[in-house]
Amino acid sequence: MASYATLLEKTRVPQPSIQRFAVISVFSKLRSAPEQFGSEAEAGREAISFCLTSESITVVDQSVHELCRLVSDSVLDLSRGLLELQSALEGCDSKLVSLFVKGLGFLIRIGYERNNGNWKFNSTENHPFVRIQSSRVETQTELLHQVSLFVMHNRRLGMVGVCEFLEPFLNFTILRIPLSDSSSSLFARELISSMASLCCSSRHEALPIFRLLMRCLKYIPGNNLEVIVKILVDAYTVVVRDLVGTGLEVTEVHLLGVQLVDGVLFLCASPHVQTTEQESVIESLKHLLAVQKDLGLAYSHDLSLVVLSLVFMLAKSTVEHEQLCILKFLLFLLKWKTESENLSVKDAAGSSVESLLLFPITALMSSPSKSIKVAASKVLSIVENFLVTVSNAPKIEVHTSKGDSPLSRVGSVVFRFMQQLWHQNDYTPSTSSFLRVAYTNGSEKQETYLGPVTWNSLLREHAERFWDKKKLSASFCLSQEIPILLGAVAGVMVMHPSLGADAIGSLTIIGGIDSKMSVPLLLAVLYFSNLLSRTNVPCQSLLSKLLGLLPSLAAQQVMIPLVVQTITPMLRKDAKGLLYATAIRLLCQTWVVNDRAFSSLQEVLRPQGFIEYISERHICISMAASIHDVCKRHPDRGVDLILSVQACIESQNCPVRALGFQSLSHLCEADVIDFYTAWDVIKKHAQHIKLDPLLAYSVCHLLKWGAMDAEAYPEDAENVLNILWEIGSSMQKPHDSQWTKARVSAIVALGQYEVSFMENKFSDFNKNCTYLLFSETNAEILNALEDLSIKIMIHEHSVRRRYVREKKVPGSKIEKLLDVIPQVIFPAGKEIKTGELPGAALLCLSYNPRDVKFGSSRSFHDVHFQYEEAFRVVVKSLQLSRNISLALISLQSLKAFMRRWMRANILSIDATTKELSSDKTSKATNNIMKSLVHMAEEALPRCAENIALALGALCAALPAASHNIKASASKFLLSWLLEHEHEHRQWTAGISLGLISSSLHVTDHKQKFQNISGLLEVLCSSKSTLVKGACGVGLGFSCQDLLTRTEASASSDIDSDSYRNQEERLLGRIVRLLSSILHGFLHTPCDILESLSALFPPGEEDNVIGLPQLLDESSDDFDDDTWGIAGLIIGLGMSVGAIYRAGKKDAVVKIKNLIVSWIPYADSLKQTSGSNSKVSVRLFSVGSCLALPIVITFCQKVELFDAHEVDDIIGCFKDLISELLIVRKSGALRKRLLMASCIGAGDLLGSVLNEGIHPVKIESVKELLELFKKCYSGLYPPVAHFGGMLGVVNVLGAGAGNLVYSHPRPRAPPASSEENEISYVSGPLLSNAYFTQQLTPVVQEIFLIAQNTKDRQLQHYAAWAISILRTYMRSGESSSLSNENQSDDSDRNSISHNVPEHTMVMKLAQGLTNPSFPLAGSPLNIGTMASALRCLSHAPRLPNLDWGATIRRLMKQETQTDVTQSGDVPKEITLREECFKFSLAHASEFDELLAFLDELSELSRFKALEESLQSCLLCHLGGLMRIFSGSRMNKLFDDVSCFVVSLSSDQTYSCDQKSSLRVSCWKGLSQCLEETSLESSEYVTKIEKCIELLFAVLPVASQSPRADQMGSVKEWSEAVTCLQKSHRDWLYKFLQVSNLEPGNEKTNFQGDLKKIQAKAKLAKLGSVPFSELGKLKAIILNCEESDIWDVLIEIVAALHHAEGGIKRQWLIDAVEISCVSSHPSTAIIFVGLLSSICCEYMPFLNLDRSTVLSDMSVTVTSLLSDPSYEVVTEPFISFLWTSLERVYSFATESDANARLSSQQIAQSERDKAPMLVKVMHYICVAFRDHLPLEKQLRLASMDMS
């Protein structure tokens, strides 16, 4: 600095000229000095600083000039110059401030020029103008001048660039206002005024400056907005006048003015803006538009947004002069619009935002200000035209332009919502609404909302919730504008052609939301009444509905006079009749709302009115209806009108009389009038009620109240009952709805009287009621009769006699004969050896240890020895004759013998030791097993055959859990089966081995597979036809246990799928081999056998050795061929059950048809390829006769057998047996065929009769019995005699030789049964009184033959046959191995179900069980039968009838085409479903019903049911759980699991049917969870497994309002209900979600989404705490929004019902997560969703992905302005700002930079980022006061263009 010292010293000289020269010299030296002494050197810098910091103004002034010259000449760097001047400015004296500001201004202009108008700064604080302003307050005056100079000097470079340069400075100036003193505010105003002045001076370059100022408006504090707007408007006025005058930029300046008005109103009409005086702002904006209009500019459609903002401001305003100002503005806009010459009808409709003004303007008509009323009326007259235009052009799609801003405003949201409501009938909505989400998604009222939901219903729910909150917190209230805006929407919708009525209902709801709306609503009613009365309005029909709104307004006490005053003019005597009648009804409804109106109503309803207006039908009816309402709602008030009631009853007008009777009925119901006293007075007016259905209905409604005092007035009560019965039973009346209603009323009235009283007054009351029910076809009447019948049944049960338990006495001669058979055949005193009657001995001999003493083991050995010796004798003498039929009968007999042997052993062990039941059974069975094996080792061939059968019988009689015994027996029999050299061992061992396989335990897979594999091996390899046939029978037995269990039955070491696959492969081998072998024996083509083989493709293990040549009939071995083929056919027939379970129903039908075709003389019934061969028929006929009953029995159970087939097949058997009996030609085949046909015919007929499905002709039964009698009494071989006897026994149900199906013991026929002439019989013959008498001689004859010792062989067969029948009849008494806890079921049935004949239960039961019951009529229709079943389902007890057969017949009956169907029966109610429900109700009492349910719920049978019955069964899983055993329930749950899994891929069901079935399954599982306790862990595990499988196929819940989503809604509803009842620990574990990764194969993304949705729904219902849902926040909000949209909605719906603290925490957490999430849009959208559903504007918001973000400008700002959310506003805005910076950086940087700097934001967010930034920026600006200034400046610096 030394080199400059001299010159610097001269600056101190107090001489200005010397000082200036010194400064010039210093800077000249700096300019020319070498580098070490230049301006950049330390000496140079010090010299400059010295000059600038001088106290002399002259020095400083010259120094600033010289410094600027250095910079201008590029000697000094610009930044250095700015720095020097800025530093000097900050430390200078205030009088020097202007010098430095001028210098800085000059340098700034130079810098801008050098950068060609593109001078940018990295932060607002570094902006030179900002630095100047920030330095000190004194700079403001000169700074304004420099800014103006800057603009004027640099405008040549482009005004747009100049404005961009100044924008940060302008924003800084505005943002500093709230943080500094008033001078900042003043400076800001002056700055804006200065720039506005520049616009005036540079009119052609003014538009960019205007846009700059408009962009800054959003940062201006509200109290400064008024002045700023006035400045801008004034400047705009100058500019627009000039530009329009010159014709330049007219369009741009026009649009700019509209944008200015819109932008200012957008700020004023924002939800977060507090209500302030905005009158001057509105006036300024109006002035701007007035200038445009004066200049001839056209009305812009963009002004529709201005109107929307004014609508909101008008609704929100409470200040009169502000309201008046807005009205004037609106009036100006509307006039301008209507004056536009180019406004067409379509344009008016397209811009019909004005229609929203209707209700707010109408509301202002109640203002006390005359000026407001005048202005409002003017606006209303113009709006009316728009409204009429819209109503006449409803299909013109309405839309509004949103201009440049995509952000929503309250007005646009309301208008958009109104548009969608208006067009919802013309366009399918693609969006839902938040109201729907809040109140119909999993709420307690969800069932109500399944299907289309109207805004009206949702708004009503919203209003109810509002009042609930109001009750909890008195301070809770809605903003003033909400009900007004709701009214604005409803007011427009009133004019809708089809939705007007709903809109009027909405107005009623709005009145309930805010009591202050009553007067506006009254005015709206008056206005619309006037409007709708005009001819040019197409909605005149709504007038009455609109007037109906008046009474609802009377809820407010102050409104009563106004409402009554409004109605009163319509009650003038000169008023029109219809108007007068309407007024009466309105007055009545007003009284309903408020009792203060009663005096006015009573005056109108005086009795004289009926005389005065006798010719005015409408008025009389209106008066009567009002009297009726009063009596119904307030009986005490009704007493005051009793004379008017009497006047109604005395009227000649039937409707008036009817209403009078109904009014009196309500008074009697309330007991304010005595019924019989009143009846004495008015009964003369009820004499002709049968002429008018309405009158009959009303009188019956009255007469039911006579029940209370009927005993006190018996004569009058009897007359009343006669009237009711006459009307209720009058079936001759026309079948119209009115008479139906009358009859129902009469029957319901009868139900009010005591049953005992009616029985005393009516003879045969029960019989008449039953006849009426069975004769009726109308569904409504049937329902009423059901209730009456149920009441009668309950009464009968309550007064029933207590029957004394008596010793059971055989009820018929047949039973007496059967009881004495053992004593007669094996008398104690005679030496009749067991060996002579071996068959009977097996069934009759019994040795009981009568002398057993405790601790004695001798008795056990004695009894065991007795049985062993008897068995030795039997096996030696019982000849099977290589006859498979005899073998099966012997096996059946041996099973009964083994059961008695075991029981005797167990009883003996009981007396000697105290062991467990299972141990006793095992010990007893081991002893028998040892004896049998010991005997078998050295047995002769005949004995060996029987011993092999005995082993099978022993195992079949054992419990399934006896593993060891069955395994040992199987091993022993397998060894015999594989001894090909011992044929006598092989064939019976094969049969027994199959029988054992069918009775193995569920876990004995290995043993079962070994047994079947052995049978298949021998079937393929044996050269003996008999052995092949026996193996076929054994395989048929084995099939009974194939595919009967699902995966839950698989053991732990065998995979469930592989286990079932093994069984399916085994079944395939069995059917394929049997079909192939039969086809080989047939030697002729057979399409069915070939198709059966094709259904089960061959495997590598099948290798059938060449079939032996069939021998001639005369050959000795011909029997082997006959019975061998018969065995194969029987085996094939036995396999139908397994084939059906495998899902091959068609194969079952083919087998049935094939076997039928092999019966001789059956060709006319079924034609099958290959059946014409005589050889085939002869050889295959024996087996087909024996196999057919098995196949038909199964087909009956699964409904594959039609009624018309019964008579045809029975006819075939009759023809066959008749021919065999007539032709006495001897021959082995005829002998065997005669035996087989008799056995088969008897078994078939017995099966059909016992099932009870198909009635059989009486003559057919008689003819068959006669043929059987001829067979066993004629000169035929003994085996033929045996066949005839077995035919008789089988007809009675014994099922001789049929080990697959057994029939329940027949019930004794009713003691008082009448012998009526009948042509058909259904049910067991021994349960039929007629046939019991017919059969007694037949049984006696066989009984006598069994006593005849002349022919030992015939005696043997007769004794055996009669013993089989005896065993069958005693089957209920000996079904258990031990007598522990054994109850006598027969006694229970005969006593506990002993129901008198005259009772209602018995009459109904007879009508259903007996098709020929006289009361039933002919024929019964489905509706009648279903009603009878419903009645009996409620019966406390049922008579002891054959209910199993009845239910099966009814199940089949509905599917028959000849059954009449009542047209009134609802389609969703089916007879088959009622059969199921009836069975479920009484299955615990009747085993046959339990068996029916067991069959129906078998998986294969269940799959074949119709969808409605499947749904019914699934819905009642809980009921089945109450009656099924534990093991059966396990299997049922496994079957349900399999069905659920297979349902998804089943193509036979439609999507709706699948959904319906899943819904039913959810309902059923819910029932099961209710029935299941915590201790039932096994059931719970099974149920939870079903729930998991159902949940896996549950569709992801969607909020789409489409109709195809209704199934999903129902599924979710039931699923959530079910999950609510599940155990908490399992539920939390099941719904646990660790992460969400779409596309990751290791995770089930869709399943996880459903779990989250389920958890949200459960949280909404309170079943799961919100803390559980909160654990998933981070996981959910870090996913892409498109993947989890529905999940977000579900969570928001749940949070809507949460406490406020939970909502606020979710709001904060969501926006915080957006700061780090890779998908920030998801979190922000969630914030938008949550804000939408929680804010006040929720009723107007649509749930649409495209609008949720844009609506956040309304929803979030509204929510954060709520006082309850103010506590979280600051942290929310802080996190939102952080997220905004992150997303803004991502959106504005290049892809490469964004990947590095934006913290892992996914690239998929790039398209959403601009909108995200815009929304977040708006919210941050709106709540900028919660941010520090530096963040506000960065906020303002963000480029939002």
From Swiss-Prot:
GO CC aspect terms: cytoplasm; cytosol; plasma membrane
Region (Disordered): 1374-1393
UniProt keywords, alphabetically: Cell membrane, Cytoplasm, Lipid metabolism, Membrane, Plant defense, Transmembrane, Transmembrane helix
GO BP terms in the entry: alkane biosynthetic process; cuticle hydrocarbon biosynthetic process; defense response; embryo development ending in seed dormancy; lipid metabolic process; negative regulation of post-transcriptional gene silencing by regulatory ncRNA; seed development
Subcellular location: Cell membrane; Cytoplasm, Cytosol
UniProt KW Transmembrane helix keyword: yes
Membrane topology classification: Multi-pass membrane protein
Gene deletion effect: Shrunken non viable seeds due to arrested embryo development when homozygous. Alteration in cuticular waxes with elevated amounts of cutin monomers in leaves. Susceptibility to the obligate biotrophic fungus E.cichoracearum and increased resistance to the necrotrophic fungi B.cinerea and A.brassicicola.
UniProt main location, coarse: membrane
Record-annotated membrane-spanning stretches: 250-270, 296-316, 347-367, 479-499, 513-533, 546-566, 943-963, 982-1002, 1123-1143, 1175-1195, 1229-1249, 1277-1297, 1719-1739
Entry protein name: Protein RST1
Originating species: Arabidopsis thaliana (Mouse-ear cress)
Lineage start: Eukaryota, Viridiplantae, Streptophyta, Embryophyta, Tracheophyta
